[in-house]
């Protein structure tokens, strides 16, 4: 019988290195160099000598995990959360809030200079709010522990898919944070623990709602357990099946939030901004920068449920909102009706494709506002230039795509006149920003 040679796999030990951190990027991630290669490392500060383990090694750069701070920086502070070292939710609690903002602002300017080839003006004052108990929305991971035969609830471990079990979270609104422990106890009483996905907690103006992902069909006994939990905690509870259908299990109210004197209804699964006070200030600033008048027609791209559209409609002659999800368009129309606004129209459209042939896109607009998701709005930027609005406000949750998309406007005859950071997510690497462009 023929014998075939099968080489044995070599076991490689993770590379461990020591280097000095030089700077922070816009995520508040440390950057240093080792043997000429850029090393990105979470949890480290400029000036610190650190020991680290290589996680991902590329030709031009590498990502490393912090193992030891040999020489701490003078501005390093103690994290306020006991789970900080493990939890992937926050990544910058070792840095004072003012230093976090400074790093993000410097990163924002650098991205415009490097990626957009644009020299931005002096940054506007940071729009911020409270740095703790600010989140009105959260998604908790759920994992069935086969060894312990129990369900664990928490957030993903830093740089891992593992779960860090938590009993509370200091950046969550307190009514959400205190729900975590009783929620875990409830889920551990269910027969269908292995079929649980994740859970979302949302604080509406009327109370708390919970959306539980369930990949199977919960038994009647499990349904009864969940309903009893919702009644005891005084919350609304919805189930989301594997096919994305959402079923109200215990519903007492129709959720909404207040904004600029308006009431905006939303449903479980809809996107809403997690930081209510900063959202209010963000909308106020966008309206102030756009300066819509009674004769102006405004285009609001990626409009969602009307977060910017409806406040704009009270200033402008007409606003057209465009959104990619039909359910969100319906919600925006409902919100216009409930607030007595009749000068706003809404359309569903794929804003990741060619929009030139769409009826609304052939209309004339005096002003444009964009608030895209992380991939940005590159596909519509050329059309925005063709519309030739006198001002464009771009609200961004990804400064990389903002800098990229800004190039299109600048090449199309616009100049960047205002730029500022929104501190929507303190203690994290997320950076929200707003830019104003004016036609030359």
UniProtKB/Swiss-Prot annotation:
Residues 10-68 form the TRAM domain. Its EC number is 2.1.1.190. The active site is at 397 (nucleophile). Pfam families: TRAM, tRNA_U5-meth_tr. Transmembrane segments: none annotated. GO terms for biological process: rRNA base methylation. The keyword Membrane does not apply. Catalyzes the formation of 5-methyl-uridine at position 1939 (m5U1939) in 23S rRNA. Belongs to the class I-like SAM-binding methyltransferase superfamily. RNA M5U methyltransferase family. RlmD subfamily. This is 23S rRNA (uracil(1939)-C(5))-methyltransferase RlmD. It comes from Aeromonas hydrophila subsp. hydrophila (strain ATCC 7966 / DSM 30187 / BCRC 13018 / CCUG 14551 / JCM 1027 / KCTC 2358 / NCIMB 9240 / NCTC 8049). The gene is rlmD.
């Amino acid at each position: 019988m023929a014998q075939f040679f099968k080489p044995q796999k070599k076991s490689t030990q993770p590379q461990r290195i020591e280097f000095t951190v030089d700077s922070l990027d816009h995520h508040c991630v440390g950057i240093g160099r080792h043997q000429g290669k850029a090393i990105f490392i979470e949890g480290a500060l400029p000036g610190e000598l650190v020991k680290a383990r290589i996680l991902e090694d590329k030709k031009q750069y590498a990502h490393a995990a912090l193992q030891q701070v040999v020489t701490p920086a003078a501005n390093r502070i103690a994290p306020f959360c006991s789970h900080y070292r493990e939890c992937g939710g926050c990544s910058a609690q070792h840095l004072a809030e003012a230093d976090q903002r400074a790093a993000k602002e410097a990163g924002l300017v650098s991205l415009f200079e490097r990626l957009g080839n644009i020299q931005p003006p002096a940054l506007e004052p940071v729009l911020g709010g409270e740095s703790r108990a600010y989140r009105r929305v959260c998604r908790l991971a759920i994992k069935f522990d086969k060894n312990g035969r129990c369900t664990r609830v928490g957030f993903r471990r830093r740089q891992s898919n593992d779960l860090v079990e938590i009993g509370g979270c200091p950046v969550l609104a307190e009514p959400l944070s205190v729900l975590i422990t009783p929620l875990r106890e409830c889920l551990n009483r269910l027969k269908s623990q292995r079929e649980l996905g994740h859970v979302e907690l949302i604080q509406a103006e009327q109370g708390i709602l919970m959306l539980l992902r369930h990949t199977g069909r919960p038994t009647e006994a499990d349904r009864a357990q969940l309903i009893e939990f919702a009644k005891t905690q005084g919350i609304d509870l919805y189930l989301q099946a594997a096919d994305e259908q959402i079923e109200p299990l215990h519903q007492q109210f129709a959720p909404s939030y207040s904004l600029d004197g308006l009431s905006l209804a939303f449903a479980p699964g809809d996107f809403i901004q997690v930081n209510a006070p900063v959202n209010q200030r963000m909308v106020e600033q966008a309206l102030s920068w756009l300066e819509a008048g009674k004769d102006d027609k405004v285009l609001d791209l990626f409009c969602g449920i009307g977060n910017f559209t409806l406040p704009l409609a009270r200033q402008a002659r007409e606003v057209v909102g465009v959104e990619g999800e039909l359910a969100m368009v319906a919600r925006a129309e409902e919100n216009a009706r409930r607030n007595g606004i009749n000068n706003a129209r809404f359309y569903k459209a794929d804003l990741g494709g060619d929009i030139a042939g769409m009826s609304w896109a052939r209309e004339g607009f005096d002003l444009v506002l964009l608030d895209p998701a992380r991939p940005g709005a590159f596909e519509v930027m050329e059309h925005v230039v063709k519309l030739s609005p006198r001002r464009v406000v771009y609200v961004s949750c990804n400064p990389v795509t903002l800098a990229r998309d800004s190039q299109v406007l600048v090449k199309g005859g616009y100049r960047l006149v205002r730029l500022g950071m929104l501190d929507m997510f303190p203690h994290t690497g997320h950076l929200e920003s707003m830019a104003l462009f004016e036609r030359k």
